[in-house]
UniProtKB/Swiss-Prot annotation:
Protein name: Type 3 secretion system ATPase
Source species: Yersinia enterocolitica
A GO BP entry: protein secretion by the type III secretion system
Enzyme Commission code: 7.4.2.8
Regulation acting on activity, per entry: ATPase activity is negatively regulated by YscL/SctL.
InterPro entries with a match to the protein in the record: AAA+_ATPase, ATPase_a/bsu_AS, ATPase_alpha/beta_chains, ATPase_F1/V1/A1_a/bsu_N, ATPase_F1/V1/A1_a/bsu_nucl-bd, ATPase_T3SS_FliI/YscN, ATPase_T3SS_SctN, P-loop_NTPase
Amino acid sequence: MLSLDQIPHHIRHGIVGSRLIQIRGRVTQVTGTLLKAVVPGVRIGELCYLRNPDNSLSLQAEVIGFAQHQALLIPLGEMYGISSNTEVSPTGTMHQVGVGEHLLGQVLDGLGQPFDGGHLPEPAAWYPVYQDAPAPMSRKLITTPLSLGIRVIDGLLTCGEGQRMGIFAAAGGGKSTLLASLIRSAEVDVTVLALIGERGREVREFIESDLGEEGLRKAVLVVATSDRPSMERAKAGFVATSIAEYFRDQGKRVLLLMDSVTRFARAQREIGLAAGEPPTRRGYPPSVFAALPRLMERAGQSSKGSITALYTVLVEGDDMTEPVADETRSILDGHIILSRKLAAANHYPAIDVLRSASRVMNQIVSKEHKTWAGDLRRLLAKYEEVELLLQIGEYQKGQDKEADQAIERIGAIRGWLCQGTHELSHFNETLNLLETLTQ
């Protein structure tokens, strides 16, 4: 008879980690979106199956905590059909998503399954939805500009390959229009887009009207609409990040877009409050502010490829001190502020240049580029300073040379800042026009 030490390591590891006895529990309490069940041996993050004895229900749920020897679970689907007779069977595994080249052009739900209920080919690999960010010392430095094809960003808010930036805007600020332009024009190999908490009507409209066949060809969409359970909406961000990590591991340059972090945080808030966490700032429990860096730190450069990430944040009443906006801005490497005033004036992309910043721009652009961008910012700031005087007819030409220059060039500057949604501007072309504007 073989002893355990004589069995090969990989087989021994599987035997030790496996459950040789099937464990089943039973639902003991349902409160809102939270289930309680007695299920010995389960772990936080583990998936369990919920089944009724008459096979009228088959649903997955995730363990999110424990209370008085009972497991707290959040279902990954609708609660209808759960009863006091519902059995809980642990799977012994955490949530994983199937990844591979076959995902390009696909629209997935928040759990990584086909949005239309169809079937996907056999995946090349399985990636855990929750995993650690790359170690800080293993990350490559951000040294290369990434052309996003948007003049105002490439010229004045240059984004580096592997950088993480936030797009902050109120409702109607032009976020979706900007995201569609980025998908079409960014010089990357793969784009992964997570649409979290969007209205169902807007999803197909965005795919067919804004994104188009060309944009979808090199993209993967993860969609969790506003009517989906909170766990699916929260998981959508992690699923999209895992898919982006797979393509990064294949040596590709990946653009990860998430719309929006605010709705992701609201889903996390629902889960945290259901689990009994105390509400803190604006009703958000502590787990929300722990989840944000855990999600965002996974983007960036690795030794093989890169994930450049842009996260949209809904700002209520232009309040940048709102908890989610404030926390997100402190985590990311830059912020792009969209202005409702510019959007109302049909100025797209509606980016408020003077309130926006890229924290790595000075390290990745040439000395000349830095000078031209600084000169244009000064002209915009000077024009904003004298704009009210111009409107009331009190400005006297000749009193301020720089103000005269700003007034003279503002038309050309605004023309350069505006860009059609289907208009592509290459990086070198953007720099040439920027140089012309500031000479």
